[in-house]
């Protein structure tokens, strides 16, 4: 089985060409149309000189062109870099320079915001503009290509061979301090992530998944890959107000919605009409407050709620099944499929139930490390010491930096970030423990 990102679309197009793949502002693209567009973009990118492992950035809101450009870059053998559309020009410039972006896909309005910073990006040679090219700014040494040209049929252009351990994406996260870090994901990381999540969410082709989170966020991008893996439909939204999300859920008969705690808090404060289509909702990116959880369960009594924990370096680590919420409401759950999660002491030995330690993640979802940052990569990505001693090479696991504990049944509980721990009288104490006292 191929674990290549773009082949999620190709396979679904072969099996169900007429099913809707993407919906944006009421305009639909079925899998056959989407697959053809991705192939055309890939061929033209290769013709433009995008080589294997070179980076293509997309600085756009969610729209059809955004998705096609990202998956087209992967199909060309390149590495896609989705840039959060709310970032300021200096932040965009940092990302373009840090990972040596060669090609940028954007709009005229956004391009005009970047006029002063793009000359600072020495590796950038081509800008693809998704709308009118009549009022383009003049920027020396840059080649401007209209989107229609990139999407035009060009015949089959053979690119480099791609394998699933190749880089597929670099996702930038701000982290807690300093400059944003670029997490490098392989094709295998992304595809196995889609398969794993779809397995426990029980996604099917009749699902309609609403994409409200930024595609620069692994949790947001996964809404696309999970949909494409299962031949479901992904509905793109660039909402300004939470109330708009409720209207889209009604209008598009949405069956799956992923969000983060701040958005769930806002949604829980609104008046909802009766919603019958919403089969499940998911939470990640932080703990959902218990009051918000109770309110949402009252608003959506027939909707399954999945509470999840993850971090960009390993995508998703744990989930709490809906039937466990009442039994252990503060738990972040157990390991998702294709993953093992351990709680380890500082010396690398395994903690006993109830004992606090660091969450360590191993398996197919462990990413390739941080782009251009060997020092931080070596701290978080380290050899896993509990493997069979006869193996000649060491497996790399990722140390989360999060303090957790497990119960006797193996369910995990988040305590705090390790950099938030307070040392007193020789002991390390979490802020949560102090608050409880």
Feature-to-residue mapping (PLM):
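Conserved structural elements of the adenylate-forming
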Residues: 35-40, 152, 183-204, 212
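ANL superfamily adenylate-forming
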Residues: 26, 111-164
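Conserved AMP-binding/adenylate-forming core of the ANL superfamily
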Residues: 2-5, 10, 18-63, 67, ...
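AMP-binding/adenylate-forming catalytic core of the ANL superfamily
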Residues: 87, 104, 249, 257, ...
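Conserved AMP-binding A3 loop
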Residues: 30-32, 161, 168-192
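Conserved pre-ATP/AMP-binding loop-to-beta segment of ANL
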Residues: 2, 17-18, 128-129, 144-145, ...
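Gly/Ser/Thr-rich phosphate-binding loop
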Residues: 254-259, 268-328, 340, 350
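Conserved AMP-binding/adenylation subdomain of ANL enzymes
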Residues: 191-208, 215-256, 270
């Amino acid at each position: 089985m191929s674990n290549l990102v773009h082949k999620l679309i190709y396979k679904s197009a072969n099996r169900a060409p007429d099913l809707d793949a993407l919906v944006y502002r009421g305009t639909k693209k079925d899998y056959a149309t989407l697959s053809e567009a991705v192939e055309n973009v890939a061929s033209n990118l290769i013709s433009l000189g995008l080589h294997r492992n070179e980076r293509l950035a997309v600085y756009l809101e969610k729209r059809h062109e955004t998705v096609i450009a990202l998956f087209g870059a992967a199909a060309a053998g390149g590495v896609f870099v989705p840039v959060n559309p709310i970032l300021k020009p200096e932040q965009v410039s940092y990302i373009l320079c840090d990972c040596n972006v060669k090609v940028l896909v954007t709009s005229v309005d956004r391009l005009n915001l970047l006029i002063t910073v793009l000359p600072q990006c020495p590796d950038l040679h081509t800008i693809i503009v998704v709308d009118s090219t009549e009022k383009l700014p003049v920027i020396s040494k840059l080649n401007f290509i209209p989107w229609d040209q990139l999407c035009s049929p060009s015949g089959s252009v053979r690119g480099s061979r791609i394998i699933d351990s190749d880089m597929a994406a670099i996702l930038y996260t701000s982290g807690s301090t300093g400059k944003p870090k670029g997490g490098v994901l392989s094709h295998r990381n992304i595809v196995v992530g889609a398969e794993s999540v779809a397995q426990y969410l029980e996604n099917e082709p009749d699902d309609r998944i609403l994409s409200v989170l930024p595609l620069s966020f692994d949790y947001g991008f996964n809404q696309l890959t999970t949909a494409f893996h299962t031949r479901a439909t992904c509905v793109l939204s660039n909402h300004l107000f939470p109330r708009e999300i409720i209207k889209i859920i009604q209008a598009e008969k949405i069956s799956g919605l992923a969000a983060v705690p701040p958005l769930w808090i806002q949604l829980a404060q609104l008046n909802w009409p009766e919603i019958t289509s919403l089969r499940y909702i998911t939470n990640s990116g932080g703990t959902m407050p218990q009051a918000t959880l109770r309110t949402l369960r009252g608003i959506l009594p027939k909707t399954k709620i999945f509470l999840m924990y993850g971090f960009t370096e390993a995508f998703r680590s744990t989930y709490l099944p809906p039937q466990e919420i009442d039994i252990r409401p503060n738990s972040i759950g157990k390991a998702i499929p294709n993953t093992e999660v351990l709680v380890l002491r500082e010396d690398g030995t395994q903690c006993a139930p109830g004992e606090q330690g660091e969450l360590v993640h191993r398996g197919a979802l462990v990413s390739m490390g941080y782009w251009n940052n060997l020092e931080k990569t070596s701290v978080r990505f380290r050899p896993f010491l509990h493997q069979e001693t006869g193996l000649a090479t060491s497996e790399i696991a990722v140390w989360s930096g999060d303090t957790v504990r497990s119960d006797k049944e193996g369910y995990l509980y988040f305590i705090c970030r390790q950099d938030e721990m307070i040392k007193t009288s020789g002991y390390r104490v979490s802020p949560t423990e102090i608050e409880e006292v």
